[in-house]
Every structure is written in C-alpha cells, then in structure tokens.
Curated annotation (Swiss-Prot):
Coiled coil regions in record: 159-256
Annotated domain remarks: The Fibrinogen C-terminal domain mediates interaction with the TEK/TIE2 receptor.
Carbohydrate attachment residues: N89, N119, N133, N151, N240, N304
Name the record gives this protein: Angiopoietin-2
Primary gene name: Angpt2
UniProt keyword list: Angiogenesis, Calcium, Coiled coil, Developmental protein, Differentiation, Disulfide bond, Glycoprotein, Metal-binding, Secreted, Signal
Purpose of the protein: Binds to TEK/TIE2, competing for the ANGPT1 binding site, and modulating ANGPT1 signaling. Can induce tyrosine phosphorylation of TEK/TIE2 in the absence of ANGPT1. In the absence of angiogenic inducers, such as VEGF, ANGPT2-mediated loosening of cell-matrix contacts may induce endothelial cell apoptosis with consequent vascular regression. In concert with VEGF, it may facilitate endothelial cell migration and proliferation, thus serving as a permissive angiogenic signal. Involved in the regulation of lymphangiogenesis.
Molecular function in Gene Ontology: metal ion binding; receptor ligand activity; receptor tyrosine kinase binding
Chief location bin: secreted
Listed CDD domains: FReD
C-alpha cells in the first residue's frame, strides 16, 4: 500500500496566472520525489520504495527481472496506475486548494491593500497635516522675516533720507563756508593792500619825522644860542632890577606922601568926587554871591587884567555859581579847531562852545576849583563825574590838566587819563601816541595815548552813534564806541 510520506507546498502572497509543471527525481537516500509546479505554488511528494524493488545499483539487469518475473511487472503497473490516480486526485485537490487559497488570498490582499492604503492615507494625511503645519509655521516665519526686512528696509530708507538731508546741509554749509572763506580772502587781500599802503604812508611819515627831527635839532641849536643870549639879558635885567627896586622904593615914598596929602581936609575939598568904578567878576560864583542868581550869559574878566570873556553861568545846578567851560548838544559847532582857537575859545555861550584854555588856566592856577562833568545819552539817562580839585597849567605846559578826588555816577575810574595829560589839537600834537590822536579822533582834548575819553569828538545823531571810534565818548560810562548826546563841563570854587 502506497502512503504519502511527506507533502510540502509553498505559495507566494502575490498571485499570478497559474501554470502546471510536473517533475520526477530521486534524492540521496534513494527515495523518489514528485514535484508539481502550479503557478507561483510548488508541491513536492516523497514516496518510499517497495521491498520488491531494487536499486539501480543491482548487479543484474532489468531485462533479467522482466524475463525472470513477469507477474511482478503487472503488479507494478497496476500500482503505478493506482498511484497516478491518487496523484491525479491529489492534484485536483491541490488545485482546488490553490483556487481556495487564491480566492482567500485575493480577499486578504485586497484587505491588506485597503489597510495599506488606509494606513498610507492616514500617514499621508498626517504627513500632509505636518507639512501644512510646517508650511504655516514657515509662512509665519517668512511673514515675520518679511516684516522685519520691511521694517529694516524702512529704517534704512529713513536713515538714508536723514543722511541725504544731513549731506545736503553739510554741502550747503561747505558752500557757505567756501563763500565766507572767499570773502575773507578778498578782505584779507584788501587789508594786506591797506597795510602795505599804511606801511608806505608810515614810511613817508617816518621820513617826514626824521626831517622834522633834523629841523628840531637845528631849532634846538638855535634856541640854545638864544638861551645864551637870554641868560646874558637876564644878568643885565638882574642889574636893572636893582635899579628898579630903588625906583620902586622912591615911588612908594612918593605914594605915601600923596596919601598923607590926600587925607588932609584941605585936599578933599579941593578935589572933585571921582566916578564910581565898574564892577568886574572873575567867575560865576562871584556873580551869584553878588545877588545875580539867574542862569545866562555874563561877562567875566581875566585875573589881573582888563581882558574880558563871555561865559554861560548855570545858577540852578547844585546850588548855582557854575562857570560853564564846555557844552555840546546838537553838533551845530565844529570842534575840530586849531590850537589858537582852543586857547581863546569859540562858539556861542547860549549853545555849543569852548570857553578858552587860557582863561581857565589863569582862573584855576591861583585858586582851588571843583570840576563837574554832566553827561547825557540818547536813551534819556544822565550821569556825572565830580573832581574835588581841578586846574590847568599854562600854555608853556600845553595846558596840562590836573584832577584829584573823583566821585559821581559816570564810572568809578576816571575817563580822563591820570596823572595830567597835555592838551592836543589837530595842529599841535602833544599826546603820547605816534598816531596823532587829535587828527584820528578829531577835536582838541587831553588825549594822553588816545585815552578813554574825548568830549570834543565828532558829533553823531541818534541811530548813528554806536561803534564810533571818533565820537563824543566817556569810556567808563558807555564804552569806547558810544557817542553821547550832550555834555557840559563846569567849574566852581571849592570853597563856594
């Protein structure tokens, strides 16, 4: 009886079109193998050998078997047929099994494919969602980056605009500075030319001064000879003075005799009554004390002389008795005058005038006088400077001014240089500067080295009175460039 010892089969999960293949072989143990191939599935059958069957290694030949045992051959044929029938049945069964497996595998494959598709769909959806989230995140990041870029771009544009504006301003400033530099260069060239002209002029002046020096040296030598002659005359005059003293003594005796004779009653009756002498005044203080207390023009007499001068007397200011020696108020009188004019005086006592250096010198040299300087600016303010002691030296000392004891509201420091300065005019330069202050600053004054004051300078009207070097100035009240509106210089005895 044939028995199926072992059956193996294998099928791929993926089914293809079926095909049949049958192969017979013998393994190493001598057992027969039958392999059936149906599509992707293969089936192997291992059948045992019967006892009557000999191996192919038997020493006798098959023809001998057939010849010696004919009955065994028929049995073998029958058995083979049975076996083939069994094999055919098994093959059919296997085909059915294969069909069943194929049908089931199709369903399973469809399910597997559906599951795979579902899983893949879920994965794809998850991946898509993740990609969408990542895309949204990236989009947000890109939006933020874009906003930052826009902000940075806007900031850069604003900075660029500011830099452009700054550049334009700098260019304008550079152009203005270039223009200013060009102007300064032109002005510098003009000033250089002017300096060269001044140097030439100064050279000419120095040459002229050298010539004047030579002339002065000649004059000094002449004066030395004159002085020698004068000394001789002085000796002669001294001798004559003794004679004069004797004559004076004789005259005094004669006068005393005449006085004795005039005092006798007989002489008084025989001599007619003389006329009343004319009253004279040396200054306005004497006029005020005489009972004349109205401000106005009065006649004053030089000390020890009959020479007279008209002067304005201020009987109202500070107790009255003031003799006005200078007055400025409207620029109607030109104060750029000569030495002689300042010596004798000029102008009108009712307006602008200068009383005269000679009269003031003689008046103040023998008595102690007070000097008051009254000042008025263009804004309506007034100030004054009061000197407790004032006098002028004689013409031989160039009418040098002497002042002490300053008080008042026009500055704590005197604007008239101290110690005393000599008087200078346009034709008599007695200052301490080689520039001739009277010609440069105009007017006659005690300039010293063109000092801090000049009340006889050029008169400038309102709105033209600032930044004027040659105006009517009083430095320690209004500075050197301010020209005053009105000034008055007046004197009065210190014991008034």
């Amino acid at each position: 009886m044939w028995q199926i010892v072992f059956l193996t089969f294998g099928c791929d999960l993926v089914l293809a079109s079926a095909y049949n293949n049958f192969r017979k072989s013998v393994d190493s143990t001598g057992r027969r193998q039958y392999q059936v191939q149906n599509g992707p599935c293969s089936y192997t059958f291992l059948l045992p050998e019967t006892d009557s069957c000999r191996s192919s290694s038997s020493p006798y030949m098959s023809n001998a078997v057939q010849r010696d045992a004919p009955l065994d051959y028929d049995d073998s044929v029958q058995r083979l047929q049975v076996l083939e029938n069994i094999l055919e049945n098994n093959t059919q069964w296997l085909m059915k099994l294969e069909n069943y497996i194929q049908d089931n595998m199709k369903k399973e494959m469809v399910e597997i494919q559906q599951n795979v598709v579902q899983n893949q769909t879920a994965v794809m959806i998850e991946i898509g969602t993740s990609l969408l989230n990542q895309t949204a995140a990236q989009t947000r990041k890109l939006t933020d980056v874009e906003a930052q870029v826009l902000n940075q771009t806007t900031r850069l544009e604003l900075q660029l605009l500011q830099h452009s504006i700054s550049t334009n301003k700098l260019e304008k400033q550079i152009l203005d500075q270039t223009s200013e530099i060009n102007k300064l260069q032109d002005k510098n060239s003009f000033l250089e030319k002017k300096v060269l002209d001044m140097e030439d002029k100064h050279s000419v002046q120095l040459q002229s001064m050298k010539e004047q020096k030579d002339q002065l040296q000649v004059l000094v030598s002449k004066q030395s000879s004159v002085i020698d002659e004068l000394e001789k005359k002085l000796v002669t005059a001294t001798v004559n003075n003794s004679v004069l003293q004797k004559q004076q003594h004789d005259l005094m005796e004669t006068v005393n005799s005449l006085l004795t004779m005039m005092s006798s009653p007989d002489y008084k009756s025989s001599v007619a009554v003389p006329k009343e002498e004319k009253t004279t005044f040396r200054d306005c203080a004497e006029i005020f004390k005489s009972g004349l207390t109205t401000s106005g023009i009065y006649t004053l007499t030089f000390p020890n002389s009959t020479e007279e001068v008209k002067a304005y007397c201020d009987m109202d200011m500070g107790g009255g008795g003031w003799t006005v020696i200078q007055h400025r108020e409207d620029g109607s009188v030109d104060f750029q005058r000569t030495w002689k004019e300042y010596k004798e005086g000029f102008g009108s006592p009712l307006g602008e005038y200068w009383l005269g250096n000679e009269f003031v010198s003689q008046l103040t040299s023998g008595h102690r006088y007070v000097l008051k300087i009254q000042l008025k600016d263009w804004e309506g303010s007034e100030a004054h400077s009061l000197y407790e002691h004032f006098y002028l030296s004689g013409e031989e000392s160039n009418y040098r001014i002497h002042l002490t004891g300053l008080t008042g509201t026009a500055g704590k420091i005197s604007s008239i240089s101290q110690p005393g300065s000599d008087f200078s005019t346009k034709d008599s330069d007695n200052d301490k500067c080689i520039c001739k202050c009277s010609q440069m600053l105009t007017g006659g004054w005690w300039f010293d080295a063109c000092g801090p004051s000049n009340l006889n300078g050029q008169y400038y009207p309102q709105k033209q009175n600032t930044n004027k070097f040659n105006g009517i100035k009083w430095y320690y009240w209004k500075g050197s460039g301010y020209s005053l509106k009105a000034t008055t210089m007046m004197i009065r005895p210190a014991d008034f």
